[in-house]
Structures are given as structure tokens and as C-alpha cells.
């Protein structure tokens, strides 16, 4: 039986700054993980260049254990094997891309990490100690972290290098809330959300009046970051690409964005719950951030907004509150007129099919219907 059908998986995050007593030890672990990643990748690359085939995890892991490979033995065995599995995943992703892409684009062979770089360290449950109540201790280290989570729900812990700090993520599971799937009928209480630049989220419903979550604070955070990043990059010596000040700037940006996204999502979901909403429809458009062209400045702002993260937060908060999520493809929703009953086609890459619609966009953010009614475009999309 698939356990994922019974559980929702969540994470508890702890930031480890340079001032933490555990920073140096975590930094050393991530450095050793990088060494093992590169050593495993080197072995795989040489095998591939010599034979045209890969060893993959099972074979290469046995060889490293048998030969007492120094980088493998530098970490606990249960940690080392997870690092090697990540090399395996990178190679399999490379092979899958190679098969699926028929556009002439060649995916890059997995590359070595920088010599002075760091890499993720993962501890599975068997490599963690729970002897001291309220704390998790990592195998063969002096690192322990506080947690209110029960041992039974904890799955693994991940140490992730970030810009100027480390992130400890405790991965745990929660039982899924069971609810009967609802069908869209005139009686269904639903809300629909469209994500954007100045308006992070525009929400409409058949229950309540439309509401808008302001996106300008995120634009402000990104503008401050981009402006100061350029200043600090100009001060860097030749062949140096980062500094402690740049890492600190990136850290502050990430924390501010995370805070705003979580608070916005929490506010929205609490409001949906108060209105007893059954279904939330989220607009989606595959590749919208990669292929967008709305001018240099708008491109920079739009791509700098982590919409995917916002959708993830919304999704898990809705799941916990019994609200179903529907994703709706929206490639032509800003051109089609709902009030005029326009058919909404789906964009297919490579096909230049022309479609005719009743209304038209008069300027950025406004739409004129067939009957000359002017509406906010974000609400037309919804």
C-alpha cells in the first residue's frame, strides 16, 4: 500500500547562523559530503567514458565500502549512502532528459561541485538519537536540536547549505484529513485565485466579494536586493563571485520573502475557512516564468517572485483545513471573455494557431468586453 496516500509530509526548519555553536561542525559535514559527491561522480564519469555505461548506486556503493574509500568513511555509513544516492539521481535525471528532449538541446553531464563548496547532508531516522526528550541528536556528532515533534512522525533530517547560513530541515509526516471529493455544481462554495506582480493574489468567489493580496512588498524586497547586489558585486576582486556581505544580503532577502509568503497564505486560507469554501481553483501556466517577456524591468521583478513556493504553502494549508485544490491551465484567460461566453483554448508549444475573442485588452491590467464594459484584467482571468 502506498503510504503517501495516508500521510502529508511537512518540514520544520531551523536556521543555523555563523554564531551558532554547531555552525563549524555542520560546515565540516557539508564539506565532507561535497567530497564524497565528487568522488562518486568521478568514478561514475570514468566508468562511463571507458565503457559507455554507468555503475549506478548499488554497485558503486559496494565498491566504496569494500575499498574503505576515505571520503565514504569520513561520514557515518547511513549518511554517506544518501549522498551517493543523490549522485545516482543526478545521473538518472541526465539520462531521462537526454531521452525526452528532441529539440537539439543537449543536457549537461552532471558536474563536479566546487572544491571549496558544500553539499547537502541527510540523516535518516536510524542515524538519529532521541534519548534526550525534546531533542534530536545526529549520529557521531555533538549536534542536537530542539523539537516538539514526536519520534514516531519524524522521517529524516536534512542539513542544507545556504548563502551565509545552514538550514536544518526536520522532515515529518501528518495524517491526511479525510474528506469526500466535491464536484463543481452551482451550489459548491468555491474561490479562484490568480497570481501576479503588483497583486500577488487576486481572489474571487461565488460566496464573497473579490479580494487582493498586495504584491508590492515583494517587489520592494527584490528591488532593494538587486540594487545592493550590483553595488557589492562591483567591489569584488577579479575571479571572485561572492562575499560574506553578498551572502548576508541573500539571506535577509530569503527570510523576508518566506515571512511575507507564509503570512499572506495563512491570511488567505483563514479567510477561506471563515467563508466555508469547499474548493480553491489556482491558475497555472507551464513555463510562464521561463518564457515570459514583459520588458527587462518587469521580467526581473516577475521571475524574482517565488510563485511556486507560494502555491506549495497554499496547497498544504488548504489540505490541512479540508479545502480541495484544483489547478486550472490559463494560457488564454487574459484574452478570452467569460462574460461573452468565449471558448478558452489551451496553448500548445510549436503550434501557431490563431484564436479570436470577443473582447480586448485596452491597457495593462484592464479588459474591455464585447458590450464595452471595462473590467480589471485579474478578475477577468478568474
How would you describe each model-predicted region?
Residues 56-165, 300, 304:
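Acidic carboxylate diad motif detector
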Residues 30-33, 83-91, 249-253, 311:
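Short amphipathic alpha-helical coiled-coil/interface segments
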Residues 2-4, 147, 154-158, 173-182:
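Catalytic micro-motifs at enzyme active sites that drive phosphoryl/nucleotidyl and oxygen chemistry
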Residues 1-81:
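Gly/serine-rich nucleotide phosphate-binding loop at the start of the catalytic core
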Residues 12-16, 143-147, 211-213:
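Generic detection of short hydrophobic beta-strand segments and adjacent strand-loop junctions
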Residues 42, 46, 52, 98-110, ...:
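Short coil/turn segments at secondary-structure boundaries
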Residues 166-382:
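Positively charged, helix-rich recognition surfaces that bind polyanionic ligands
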Residues 11-15, 156, 190:
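Well-ordered beta-strand positions in beta-sheet-rich domains
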Amino acid at each position: 500500500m502506498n503510504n503517501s496516500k495516508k500521510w502529508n509530509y511537512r518540514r520544520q526548519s531551523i536556521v543555523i547562523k555563523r554564531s551558532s555553536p554547531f555552525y563549524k561542525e555542520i560546515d565540516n559535514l557539508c564539506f565532507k559530503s561535497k567530497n564524497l559527491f565528487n568522488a562518486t561522480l568521478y568514478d561514475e564519469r570514468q566508468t562511463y567514458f571507458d565503457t559507455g555505461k554507468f555503475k549506478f548506486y548499488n554497485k558503486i556503493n559496494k565498491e566504496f565500502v569494500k575499498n574503505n574509500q576515505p571520503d565514504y568513511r569520513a561520514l557515518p555509513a547511513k549518511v554517506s549512502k544518501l549522498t551517493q544516492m543523490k549522485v545516482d539521481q543526478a545521473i538518472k535525471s541526465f539520462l531521462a532528459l537526454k531521452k525526452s528532449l528532441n529539440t537539439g538541446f543537449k543536457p549537461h553531464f552532471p558536474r563536479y561541485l566546487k572544491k571549496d563548496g558544500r553539499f547537502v547532508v541527510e540523516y535518516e531516522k536510524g542515524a538519529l538519537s532521541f534519548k534526550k526528550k525534546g531533542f534530536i541528536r545526529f549520529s557521531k556528532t555533538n549536534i542536537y536540536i530542539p523539537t516538539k515533534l514526536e519520534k514516531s512522525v519524524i522521517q529524516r533530517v536534512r542539513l542544507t547549505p545556504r548563502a551565509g547560513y545552514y538550514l536544518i530541515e526536520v522532515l515529518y509526516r501528518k495524517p491526511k484529513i479525510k474528506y469526500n471529493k466535491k464536484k463543481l455544481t452551482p451550489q459548491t462554495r468555491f474561490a479562484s485565485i490568480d497570481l501576479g506582480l503588483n497583486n500577488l493574489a487576486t481572489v474571487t468567489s461565488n460566496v464573497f466579494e473579490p479580494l487582493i493580496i498586495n504584491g508590492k512588498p515583494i517587489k520592494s524586497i527584490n528591488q532593494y536586493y538587486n540594487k545592493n547586489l550590483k553595488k557589492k558585486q562591483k567591489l569584488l576582486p577579479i575571479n571572485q563571485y561572492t562575499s560574506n556581505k553578498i551572502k548576508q544580503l541573500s539571506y535577509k532577502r530569503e527570510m523576508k520573502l518566506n515571512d511575507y509568503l507564509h503570512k499572506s497564505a495563512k491570511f488567505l486560507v483563514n479567510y477561506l475557512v471563515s467563508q466555508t469554501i469547499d474548493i480553491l481553483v489556482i491558475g497555472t501556466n507551464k513555463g510562464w516564468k521561463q518564457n515570459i517577456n514583459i520588458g527587462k524591468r518587469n521580467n526581473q521583478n516577475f521571475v524574482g517572485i517565488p510563485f511556486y513556493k507560494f502555491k506549495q504553502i497554499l496547497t498544504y494549508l488548504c489540505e490541512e483545513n479540508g479545502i480541495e485544490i484544483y489547478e486550472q491551465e490559463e494560457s488564454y484567460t487574459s484574452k478570452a471573455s467569460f462574460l461573452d461566453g468565449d471558448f478558452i483554448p489551451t496553448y500548445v508549444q510549436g503550434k501557431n494557431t490563431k484564436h479570436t475573442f470577443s473582447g480586448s485588452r485596452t491597457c495593462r491590467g484592464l479588459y474591455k468586453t464585447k458590450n464595452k464594459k471595462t473590467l480589471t484584467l485579474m478578475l477577468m482571468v478568474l
